């Protein structure tokens, strides 16, 4: 990031306007760190603006922030899942859980070890998830992988079934579904009713797993609206803020001072 900003500075010697998306629960120290990144190590005169990540997602999904009476967003990322409710132009409830794509990979590793006595790495688990991950019971596929035999310690090739992969994925999806249900129970009734009418917006890179929206719908009893932007939703929201002056209302600056 520093090298990219340094290159940009060579074309804009008077500084740039830099936008970051931040978690809702970011502390003052964490927010200050963004400014340090943008202006440290010989970088200078850059103005830093921040947009809360749920608001950026909402803008990307064309949710009318100022008039929304209650919209819920679920962003399933690599390491965590963020749950947020937006109403009257602000995030009123938000929390994150340590469950995402990487935890699914770990579960797949565990299932392969349990069913085949084979140790595989995170990259192999990720490839299996991408190739055979389906949150439905009709998926019947197989893939060959090479791993380390748990007993002999020697390399071994094995054919892995999609049911083994999906067992690991569904275990994590069950946790996410239970958290969403608990989250809705803590949401004010009138807002929860609006969310039930509108549906829950689903974004994030891990939302690419086929049938995840219907699976979570069965877990929670709510309908889900899957974003086709996936991992790009937050970036697309920032892009809209940069290009539209009216949307810059949702960005806030950091007080700048010499480091």
Language model segments and positions:
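Nucleotide/phosphate-binding catalytic cleft detector across ATP-hydrolyzing
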Residues: 1-73, 86-200, 207-234, 239-259
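Short acidic, Gly/Ser-rich segments with clustered Asp/Glu that frequently serve as metal-coordination loops
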Residues: 78-80
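A structural feature that tracks compact, well-ordered secondary-structure segments
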Residues: 82-84
């Amino acid at each position: 990031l520093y090298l990219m900003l340094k290159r940009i500075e060579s074309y804009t010697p008077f500084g740039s306007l830099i936008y970051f998306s931040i978690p809702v629960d970011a502390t003052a120290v964490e927010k200050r760190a963004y400014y340090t990144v943008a202006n440290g190590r010989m970088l200078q005169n850059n103005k830093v603006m921040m947009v809360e990540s749920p608001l950026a997602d909402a803008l990307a999904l064309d949710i009318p922030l100022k008039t929304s009476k209650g919209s819920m967003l679920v962003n399933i990322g690599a390491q965590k899942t963020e749950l947020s409710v937006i109403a009257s132009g602000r995030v009123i409830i938000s929390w994150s859980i340590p469950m995402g794509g990487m935890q699914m990979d770990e579960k797949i590793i565990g299932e392969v070890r349990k069913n085949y006595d084979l140790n595989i790495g995170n990259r192999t688990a990720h490839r299996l998830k991408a190739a055979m991950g389906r949150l439905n019971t009709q998926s019947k596929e197989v893939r060959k992988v090479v791993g380390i035999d748990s007993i002999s310690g020697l390399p071994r090739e094995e054919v892995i079934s999609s049911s083994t992969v999906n067992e690991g994925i569904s275990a994590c999806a069950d946790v996410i579904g239970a958290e969403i249900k608990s989250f809705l129970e803590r949401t004010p009734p009138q807002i929860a009713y609006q969310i039930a009418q509108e549906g829950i917006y689903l974004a994030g890179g891990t939302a690419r797993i086929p049938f995840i929206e219907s699976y979570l719908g069965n877990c929670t009893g709510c309908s889900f609206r899957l974003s086709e932007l996936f991992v790009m939703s937050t970036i697309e929201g920032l892009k809209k803020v940069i290009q539209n002056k009216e949307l810059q209302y949702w960005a806030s600056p950091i007080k700048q001072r010499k480091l």
